[in-house]
């Protein structure tokens, strides 16, 4: 039993166009799918691969059934399939397959090839099966140690600065400008005027008691101003 071409309705069909859902002979296939590039990409299934012995249709029981409806769980011929699954009806959305297990009205060949390639490509499966690689953890920031060293350097610099400041103020401390008890060397010593030998002899001559006619007159202390310097003379009591 052969399937008739849906275009010319004279020659037997050699293939089925899934996009057009039509059985075509070789001549009509060239005319229909050579019209444009989009039509040339339609997926087509050759009927040579189908079995020559088809089961009878579950509805009419006369014609050979090569369409299987999943929802109705029935094998249908083309005429019964069109009558049962008419467009704009609820049954039009039923899933239907050819007797070989290939779904009817699939998308274009290029789309199916991409789907099959992604589905059966071992490289894609390996990429999907591989767990996501964990990125190495970023190194912990070194701000704590840097801050510690910076603070230590700051403390050292402050200590050195204090030592320098104290070193500069040592000479003020030696002069007794602060409230601390000064050293004995820093205290000013009262200087005793140095007298030359001539001054001492001259002073000794003045220390001698002068003879006076007045016996009861008391001895007086005399002061002598020499070179605009005041000298205190101790009387000789011997």
UniProtKB/Swiss-Prot annotation:
GO molecular function ontology, one term from the record: DNA-binding transcription factor activity
Superkingdom, taxonomy of origin: Eukaryota
Recorded consequence of changing residue 20 to A: Abolishes interaction with HY5
Major subcellular location class: nucleus
Location of the region described as Interaction with COP1 in the Swiss-Prot/TrEMBL record: 226-238
Cellular component terms per the entry's GO annotation: nucleus
Region annotation (Disordered) ranges: 115-139
Pfam families: zf-B_box
InterPro entries according to UniProt: B-box_zinc_finger, CONSTANS-like_Bbox1, Znf_B-box
PTM statement from Swiss-Prot or TrEMBL: COP1-mediated ubiquitination and subsequent proteasomal degradation of BBX25/STH occurs in the dark.
Compartmental location: Nucleus
SMART domains listed in its UniProt record: BBOX (SM00336)
One record GO biological process: negative regulation of photomorphogenesis
Chain intervals with Polar residues compositional bias: 121-137
Keyword Aminoacyl-tRNA synthetase applies: no
Disruption phenotype: Reduced length of hypocotyls.
Record key words, sorted: Metal-binding, Nucleus, Repeat, Repressor, Transcription, Transcription regulation, Ubl conjugation, Zinc, Zinc-finger
Binding site for Zn(2+) 1: 5, 8, 28, 33
Positions of B box-type zinc fingers: 5-47, 57-99
Positions of Zn(2+) 2 binding: 57, 60, 80, 85
Function: Acts as a negative regulator of seedling photomorphogenesis. BBX25/STH and BBX24/STO function as transcriptional corepressors of HY5 activity, leading to the down-regulation of BBX22 expression. BBX25/STH acts additively with BBX24/STO during de-etiolation and the hypocotyl shade avoidance response.
Subunit note: Interacts with COP1 WD40 domain. Interacts with HY5 and HYH.
Record-given protein name: B-box zinc finger protein 25
